[in-house]
Regions:
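Helix-terminus/linker motif at the lipid-water interface of multi-pass membrane proteins
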Residues: 108, 112-131, 201-208, 264-271, ...
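Membrane-helix interface/capping residues of multi-pass secondary transporters
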Residues: 118, 127-130, 168, 244, ...
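Short runs within selected transmembrane alpha-helices of multi-pass transporters and secretion channels
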Residues: 152, 220-239, 250-258, 276-289, ...
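Transmembrane helical elements of multi-pass membrane transporters/channels
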Residues: 98-117, 220, 231, 254, ...
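Short alpha-helical transmembrane segments in multi-pass integral membrane proteins
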Residues: 2-36, 41, 46-48, 54, ...
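Residue-level signal for short hydrophobic patches within transmembrane helices
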Residues: 89, 93-112, 116, 140-147, ...
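Small-residue hotspots at the loop-to-helix junctions and early N-terminal turns
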Residues: 125-139, 214, 218, 277, ...
Length: 522
């Protein structure tokens, strides 16, 4: 679960860009976020059961049923022992780095094409178009995209466990079933987002001078929600089975394509926010086609089919995490509505901030995916001795790397804002936002560590409840009840560290109790 500080940060926190996708979720992912422009499982066993850290009897039954449903597609070649799996056998800290860097690059390129949208739109079409891309419309899209990111991350846990247990037939059927469900969810989001675009933007008090471009952006990008959901699921599955390089190659290609289309539609044809939206939607379609081709050549090496019993497990694993991601985004939508009341300059600064702080969220998201994948595969392989070591190694690396990221964003706050908009008032507002909030980002790191570890262990129900109250409820109350008492931008921003602190404490208590129930094996 990563939480960008803007609708786009996680790719879109996670966004048309919230592709902060992943074995556990997309960089994402990286567009609804912790908030500045909008801006982060159920288990092999039930999360309330002491057996949640292992493939339980219930899961064993599901595995057996899945195998039976895939029996006709299994062959001796499928069930033979694979080559050594470095995630379950290699030196942990080295393998984490080998797995992490392709993920980070994937998140970087995913966020790059979202950031290029903002750069080109802000510099060529002006602050009104920039506000449309990164303001209310981006926040609304972030709700759907982050749900897809979270859902795919939860479903990918099942893929990681099947892969670690070498259940190839069950893996193929699970992936096909997950892709079908993702397509249905994407269609649902597209219909809702397109059909109710105008009333949604009106409820969010979108300023009149940016309502029209926001409406165009929301409706056009909503057409890409179906391929976005499919891509997120496909990329999450590939990462869950240890392949983080091909999703990276896909993102590099689509990023380059998106930049070219941005220049064509926005700079060349002068289409403004609608042009940026068209470029995003087309590239989402391209990424979905490419990831399906890769899956066809890897996971679907033989015939596979959808399976009702797997659909139930996928929904049980994916829905809690999907809703957890939506909670962050929904809470940020509430704050976005508050920010709209400060005028277009503040909205533009908030949108730019959301693109800049994506650097933090994509690093967080990549580490979170790494934790989930290592924990999930080692549990599936029966290597529970490696679980806590994976978590410890990732924790040390996260604090070291993210400490440098936070320092860099704090120091270069104003120059980074100037990249997006030349208006001095917008730059000043955005720079103050970053300098105020950046020191608090350390509070979020423990949340990502514990949520990702629990997700890999197969526990998502209680973490989702913690997230609901610690983030969604508390942050919404902050925006609606506390901010009006002292109506300033800093008071809006203070809602992020307050909710991070409360959620971190709640996770720490639950995580320690959860591990204690598992005994010394973990």
């Amino acid at each position: 679960m990563s939480e960008p500080v803007t609708p786009d940060s996680r790719t879109n926190e996670n966004s048309p860009s919230v592709l902060q996708t992943a074995a556990a979720k997309n960089a994402t992912t990286v567009a609804a976020k912790a908030g500045v422009t909008a801006p982060p499982q159920v288990s092999a066993a039930d999360s309330s059961s002491p057996a949640a850290l292992q493939v339980s009897a219930a899961d064993s039954d599901s595995l057996a049923a899945a195998q039976a449903s895939a029996a006709d597609s299994d062959s001796p070649a499928d069930s033979r022992a694979r080559a050594v799996n470095p995630i379950t056998e290699g030196i942990i800290w080295k393998q984490i780095l080998f797995f992490f860097f392709p993920l980070l690059l994937s998140s970087f390129f995913q966020q790059l094409y979202n950031t290029v949208d903002a750069l080109i739109v802000g510099r060529i079409a002006g602050k009104e178009a920039l506000s449309a891309v990164g303001g209310s419309a981006g926040s609304v899209l972030g709700i759907f995209i982050m749900f897809y990111v979270g859902f795919s991350g939860g479903a990918a846990v099942l893929a990681a466990q099947f892969f670690g247990a070498k259940k190839d037939g069950a893996l193929r059927d699970a992936v096909r079933t997950a892709l079908l469900i993702s397509g249905i969810l994407g269609l649902t989001g597209a219909v809702l987002c397109f059909g109710f675009a105008h009333p949604i933007l009106a409820v969010m008090h979108t300023p009149d001078d940016i309502l029209a471009p926001s409406l165009w952006y929301l409706r056009v990008v909503s057409l890409g929600l179906i391929p976005n959901a499919v891509y997120n699921m496909g990329a999450a599955v590939l990462r869950a089975i240890g392949d983080s390089r091909r999703p990276l190659a896909i993102l590099i290609f689509t990023c380059i394509t998106n930049i070219a289309l941005d220049f064509l539609f926005v700079a060349g044809l002068r289409m403004g926010a609608a042009g940026a939206a068209a470029a995003t939607a087309l590239c989402q379609l391209l990424s979905a086609v490419l990831v399906l081709i890769v899956l066809q050549k890897t996971v679907f090496t033989r015939s596979s089919k959808t399976a009702a019993i797997l659909a139930g497990r996928i929904l049980k694993l994916g829905l809690p995490l999907g809703f957890a991601e939506v909670m962050y985004t929904f809470a940020n939508v509430v704050l976005m509505a508050v920010v709209n009341g400060f005028g277009t300059d503040t909205v533009a600064a908030y949108a730019a901030y959301g693109k800049i702080d994506a650097l933090f969220w994509m690093v967080v998201g990549s580490f979170g995916i790494s934790i989930t994948t290592f924990v999930g595969q080692n549990i599936g392989a029966g290597r529970r001795d490696r679980v806590m070591q994976s978590i410890r190694d990732c924790t040390v690396m996260m604090f070291l790397v993210l400490g440098m990221v936070i320092a860099a964003l704090y120091i270069f706050a104003y120059p980074l804002q100037q990249l997006f908009c030349a208006d001095p008032n917008v730059v000043e507002i955005g720079g103050r936002m970053m300098r105020f909030l950046m020191p608090f980002y350390f509070l979020y790191i423990p949340i990502e560590i514990m949520f990702s570890a629990l997700r890999g262990m197969g526990d998502s129900v209680i973490p989702t409840i913690i997230t609901f109250f610690g983030v969604c409820v508390l942050r919404s109350v902050w925006g609606l009840a506390v901010v009006p008492l002292h109506h300033t931008v800093n008071m809006v921003l203070l809602g992020f560290p307050v909710t991070w602190a409360v959620t971190t404490i709640a996770f720490a208590i639950y995580f320690s109790l959860y591990l204690r129930r598992q005994g010394p094996a973990i």
